[in-house]
Amino acid sequence: MTDKQHTRSVSESENPAIPSPTPKVSRPRRNKDWWPNQLDLSVLHTHSHLSCPLEEEFDYADQFKGLDVDALKQDLIQLMTTSQDWWPADYGHYGPLFIRMSWHAAGTYRIADGRGGGGEGQQRFAPLNSWPDNANLDKARRLLWPLKKKYGQKVSWADLLIFAGNVAYESMGFKTFGFGFGRPDVWEPEDIFWGPEDTWLGDERYSGDRELAKPLANVQMGLIYVNPEGPGGNPDPLAAARDIRETFARMAMNDEETVALIVGGHTVGKTHGAAPAAGNVGLEPEGAPIEEQGLGWKNKFGSGKGSDAITSGLEGAWTNNPTKWDNGFLENLFKYEWELTTSPAGAKQWKPKNPEANDTVPDAHGASRRHSPTMLTTDLSLRMDPIYGPIAKRFHDNPDQLEDAFAKAWFKLLHRDMGPRSRYLGPWIPEAQLWQDPIPPVDHELVSEQDIDALKRTILGSGLSVPELISTAWGAAASFRGTDKRGGANGARIRLAPQKDWESNEPSRLAKVLTALERIQNDFNGSQSGGKKVSLADLIVLGGCAAVEEAARKAGFNISVPFAPGRTDASQEQTDESIFDVLEPIGDAFRNYFRAEDPLSPETRLLDRANLLKLTAPQMTVLVGGMRMLDANHGQSRHGVFTDKPGTLSNEFFVNLLDIGTAWRPSVADKSVYEGIDRTSGKTRWTATAADLVFGAHSQLRALAEVYACDDGKERFVRDFVAAWNKVMNLDRYDLLGTRNGRRAVTSKPV
């Protein structure tokens, strides 16, 4: 069993061992306190213009055009090399502190759901600003304030927090792979599940044989990665290697990238543990007194800074030149034999057995003092693990290979959550990488509105049904994740492995649709005398739009679904199957698709999916109702299809769900299904899942459903469905972005 108390008292990579915050028990009760299992829709209503102090038409990309990036870089270098008395720089250089800040901002990214990362500047807000692993990074951000003040909205906090670390490496002699700006700020914290624990450094996220719960990547609450003293504070390098491999894999890093990142990260800087945190270190920023003005971890030991700093229970530097890029980390790791020791704070770390290592490392604040190098348990993992060891030795023998591997892995770490390369800004954007899911540029003339109308008629006359067209377009577009901006219809990767074989996409049905659409594509492109072409990606979306128009026509509404050509088709060689599989939905409530092994309830999975698709609660509501009427359920199930006219875009889902003549009960045959019983006849009228019934049971969702169920809600339902559908179809179309809230789209008349 993990000794949590011991872990809390001494452990982290750069986190103080401090007590967990004490909950305030006298605060007013919220609905969540009374009904903890209630579906919380607030996650769908964050980051609106109501929380943003900037004008609604503010466009960060436009503001960035006025930024002198070279001047900003020089200002950063000047700042890094000018030590300030209120928080002295180790070795006279803040570079390592800024690298840790950037690393910890980006390093919260997890590949399972794309959440975390540095793309929004979330390190400024709770809980991340007060995580024990982020201790004293409040000072790093405060050091940056004069530059943020100087450049204003031309550079976002999100970009500045990441760029500072990149510049820091360059200032210490390392040639980085490049850098992309383009991270707009948000103004409130993201509501993310960081783990089940209610204490700092708790590790209730494990079960069985140290199996880490999904989607989590870090090993303990409040750590960015792993415990540097080893699992649960146990200084076992091989056991630590297992944690490292699992955690970094869940951050989308392979073994070589992992070794390079750890080596490169520990080539500069030092850890801080001049004394035990208990009795010396104060509250984190969110709990600190108001007069501290957002700074936390006030230290009463000695001067409280410099040589007396307490950030971790660990103390010491890894290399002989802690502000210079070199191969010193690996040289020391392999040169010396290491023995277990403790820091002044009592943390478990390692020192050389070799006496010649004494006095080889300069003191961070006193020229007359010297030290021996220090290694952490997780550092020794790189030497002792049978997989990491040979990689580290190769890097030791070939420093140029380390530099290349670290440059690319560092770039990947900083940009993993930014999505396609087209979102990057600035002059230092390198060539496309496979992990960016590259999509070819448009190299042909796009179809006209007349072509679009003709193609829609051809699609609707091809024998493909409305449900088939809707399901295919939705499967392509709704693979998008607003967290790390991956997925979407652009690229037509739904026709490629692994997406074409996902159970959620019904492979045999999908193959039929794709074959028909490819035939239409070939016929159209082959008939053009000029350079005009239509991509399969565009046809997939256009087919869905045509199907929506046809279903609306059947309901008596002559509507036009916006469509903007310009998507292109990616190749299998441009698709990394190993990292693309994480986009496969565990469940898709919009199509009433769920897996038995899913730990989340259908209604919770619905909320999670809506959050990934950047939908509001009204948009989520109207899409579910519309998808049911379009008969787009997975496996053509009838659950939630409350109509005798499937394929017609009517508001009957809401009308019949809210019909007080129907009583609902759990099905005896299937516990995941509910039966709607006619109160008069006792006969079964409908079947549904929890993802359907939640719109009648949840008070907020019922209020939304009532709007569309009203007699005057029919046209509103169709109009709002089309708007929400268009949003989903274009979530990945960054080429269409005008202002922050606007998109340009070519509209076409319905058939």
UniProtKB/Swiss-Prot annotation:
Q: Name one GO cellular component term.
A: cytosol
Provide the cross-link position: Tryptophyl-tyrosyl-methioninium (Tyr-Met) (with W-103).
Y225-M251
Q: Does the keyword Oxidoreductase apply?
A: yes
Q: What is its EC number?
A: 1.11.1.21
Modifications after synthesis and translation: Formation of the three residue Trp-Tyr-Met cross-link is important for the catalase, but not the peroxidase activity of the enzyme.
Q: How is the cofactor bound?
A: Binds 1 heme b (iron(II)-protoporphyrin IX) group per dimer.
Where are the active-site residues found? H104 (proton acceptor)
Please name the Gene3D superfamilies in this protein's record: 1.10.520.10, Peroxidase, domain 2 (1.10.420.10)
Residue numbers marked as site, Transition state stabilizer: R100
First-level EC class: oxidoreductase
Q: Does the keyword Aminoacyl-tRNA synthetase apply?
A: no
Q: What does this protein do?
A: Bifunctional enzyme with both catalase and broad-spectrum peroxidase activity.
The family classification in the record reads: Belongs to the peroxidase family. Peroxidase/catalase subfamily.
| Oligomer status and interactors | Homodimer or homotetramer.
Record protein name field: Catalase-peroxidase 1
Q: Which organism is it from?
A: Cupriavidus pinatubonensis (strain JMP 134 / LMG 1197) (Cupriavidus necator (strain JMP 134))
